[in-house]
């Protein structure tokens, strides 16, 4: 769902930072 996409996006952002 949308929540899963948001969590995945947050994980990717944390990996980049």
Swiss-Prot record:
One of the GO biological process terms: defense response to Gram-positive bacterium
InterPro entries assigned to the protein according to its UniProt record, in alphabetical order: Antimicrobial_8
Organism field: Uperoleia mjobergii
Tissue: Expressed by the skin dorsal glands.
Miscellaneous comment in the UniProt entry for this protein: The amyloid fibrils are cytotoxic to PC12 neuronal cells, whereas the native peptide displays relatively weak cytotoxic activity. Interacts with mammal mimetic membranes (DMPC:chol) leading to transmembrane pores.
Top-level taxon: Eukaryota
Described purpose of this protein according to its UniProt entry: Shows antibacterial activity against B.cereus, L.lactis, L.innocua, M.luteus, S.aureus, P.multoci, S.hominis, S.epidermidis and S.uberis. Strong activity against M.luteus (MIC=2 uM) compared to S.hominis, S.epidermidis and S.aureus. Acts by inducing permeabilization of bacterial membranes. Forms amyloid fibrils which, in the presence of bacteria, aggregate on the bacterial membrane leading to severe membrane damage and cell death.
Residues recorded as bearing Valine amide in the entry: 17
Source organism phylogeny: Eukaryota, Metazoa, Chordata, Craniata, Vertebrata
GO molecular function annotation: protein homodimerization activity
One Pfam family cited in the UniProt record for this chain: Antimicrobial_8
Intracellular or extracellular location(s): Secreted; Target cell membrane
Protein name as catalogued: Uperin-3.5
Membrane in keyword set: yes
Effect after changing residue 1 to L: Loss of amyloid fibril formation but no effect on membrane disruption activity against bacterial mimetic membranes (DMPC:DMPG). Displays a significant increase in amyloid fibril formation
Temperature dependence: Thermostable. Retains antibacterial activity against M.luteus after heat treatment at 60 degrees Celsius for 10 minutes.
